[in-house]
A protein has these predicted regions:
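Structured catalytic core of nucleotide-sugar glycosyltransferases
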Residues: 1-127
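Short conserved micro-motifs on helix faces and helix-strand junctions that flank
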Residues: 1, 8, 67-69, 158, ...
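Hydrophobic helical membrane-anchoring modules
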Residues: 14, 177-305
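Acceptor/aglycone-binding surface of glycosyltransferases and processive sugar-polymer synthases
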Residues: 67-69, 74-83, 100-176, 197-207, ...
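Solvent-exposed polar/charged
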Residues: 57, 82, 108, 135, ...
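Residue-level recognition of specific faces of alpha-helices
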Residues: 61, 73, 88, 102-105, ...
């Protein structure tokens, strides 16, 4: 098998057929009929699965992996990659915001640059002002707290060599962030500037984005724990200096401490920090708890061919 095209389905019913047609044309132009298209149904609540199954009645190059429930975009993608068999794998979203026709230009760049992965980045992030700002903050905070040099505005679409895919799926985290794994897997990678179309509403609201950021950071770095330690050290030192100041004022300047307002404010402030730091440690402990259970990160209900 020369090429595998991997995509996920979630509220994708209006795109499934057109995606298959366009992806098939792109694959045929590149490798003839030696390709497969893998759909991973991530517990989609609409008729995405039914439409994909209908395609299998007419075409024999389709594999559908039906997950038992919604496990999340990243885990669904990894499941699809694990079932791919092509010498090259083209991973892409099925909502047609990312064009299947990019396969050709990605392949040209991969050949020209002799790389193991070519992936797309947007020159301008789509969406409203708030979405653009929160997106930029996500990448900045992620790089700051993990040390992983993830470029801004990456997209799902990417063409990968078989050895790169094998290395990628060797990661066995249960709480995974595939965006970081793409980078730390290594090999020679190159980017291509692309422009996504706006054909659908995003399924990521602010709460999901915040949860994604926390998961991404705590999956790739212990720096938040290091920063917690140094923050505590700094606050302890500051409190010690403040106590010395109060003692000097009391014994040598006959000036008693001021009222309770500043004391209450300080108690609230430090109590908040304590709760925050305990929460950070709790997140890491919960991840360790989940990983030690060694549960599969997805469960497959059925595979259609």
């Amino acid at each position: 098998m020369k090429l595998s095209i991997v995509t996920t389905l979630y509220k994708s019913e209006e795109y499934v057929v057109e995606f298959y047609e366009r992806a098939s044309r792109a694959a045929q132009n590149l490798v003839g009929n030696d390709y497969e298209i893998i759909f991973v149904n991530d517990g989609s609540p609409d008729s995405s699965l039914d439409k994909a199954i209908h395609l299998t009645h007419e075409h024999d190059n389709i594999i559908i992996i039906d997950l038992s429930r919604n496990f999340g975009h990243h885990k669904a993608m990894m499941t699809g990659l694990e079932h791919s068999s092509g010498d090259h794998v083209f991973l892409i979203d099925s909502d047609l915001e990312e064009k299947p026709e990019w396969l050709s230009s990605f392949n040209e760049q991969m050949t020209k640059d002799s790389t193991d992965m070519v992936y797309g980045i947007q020159d301008h992030r789509k969406g409203a002002f708030v979405e653009k700002v929160t997106g930029a903050l996500f990448y900045k905070i992620f790089r700051l707290l993990t040390g992983v040099a993830q470029p801004n505005n990456i997209v799902t679409a990417r063409l990968m060599s078989r050895r790169y895919v094998n290395a990628l799926i060797s990661h066995k985290e249960r709480e995974l962030n595939i965006g970081g794994l793409w980078i730390i897997t290594g090999f020679i990678q190159s980017t291509q500037v692309v422009q996504k179309s706006s054909s659908s509403q995003t399924t990521y609201n602010f709460a999901r984005k915040l949860s994604h950021l926390v998961n991404a950071i705590t999956s790739f770095s212990s720096l938040p724990l290091v920063y917690t330690f140094y923050t505590g050290l700094l606050l302890s030192f500051s409190a010690f200096i403040f106590i010395i100041k109060l003692l000097i004022q009391f014994f040598f300047m006959a000036k008693p401490p001021d009222g309770y307002t500043s004391m209450i404010a300080s108690i609230w402030f430090f109590s908040g920090l304590v709760i925050l730091f305990l929460g950070i440690q709790g997140i890491y402990l919960s991840k360790m708890f989940i990983e030690t259970k060694n549960r599969p990160y997805t469960i497959i209900r059925k595979i259609y061919k």
